[in-house]
């Protein structure tokens, strides 16, 4: 039984890749066809690979592992934050600060500064300081919150990264590779899949596609934490799996043509 249905993927536009001139040849095995200059991703393979990713993340979570959700592009920011929080995990949804993983000790010092500033605001220290100084401290706090708020309570470097658009998150990917941290990622037709450990061939530009896949990874964490016997996070329609009818749906959608990206 698959954790996601072909219908859900189609409705979210997961199958729409990039323009054919912007492709990475290494993604050829995951491409179904080409339509009006756009590559169409093979959703039959995506369904299976989502299952692989789901089980991988679920196993990490079941062993009390830390999952870091990463997506700094505009289309991913909201989903990354909301789904990571729902799963009780951590996230980076604005600019990735170099050294976030490879220089974790320094990052922890900046996080401590953020916590200190928050405490100063809460205990009334700000009320006793000159307005100009408070304005500067607030500016510093807001900046730290923007970039580090999602990992403020992360106990240690993550056990796995879930990434939306590895091309954009190159620094995060390279840091994870240096530390042998596995990467699960949404990989579009313009991306090199070799830099990702567990790939999910997918449109990584459409908000609905990003939300759908990210929510499934959050579901995997929730299920892993609840235990193997608890399947409360799974949707009823998931049981339909991949069928010939589902493939016909994909072919029909391609024929009707829609050049969303």
Curated annotation (Swiss-Prot):
GO biological process assignments: translation
Region described as Disordered: 224-261
Signal peptide bounds: none
GO terms for cellular component: cytosolic small ribosomal subunit
Acidic residues composition bias: residue spans: 228-239
Keyword entries, A-Z: Ribonucleoprotein, Ribosomal protein
Keyword presence, Signal: no
Gene Ontology molecular function terms on file: structural constituent of ribosome
Entry keyword annotation includes Metal-binding: no
Bias type Basic and acidic residues, positions: 242-255
InterPro entries tied to this protein: Ribosomal_uS2, Ribosomal_uS2_bac/mit/plastid, Ribosomal_uS2_CS, Ribosomal_uS2_flav_dom_sf
Family: Belongs to the universal ribosomal protein uS2 family.
Name of the protein in its database record: Small ribosomal subunit protein uS2
Organism: Pediococcus acidilactici
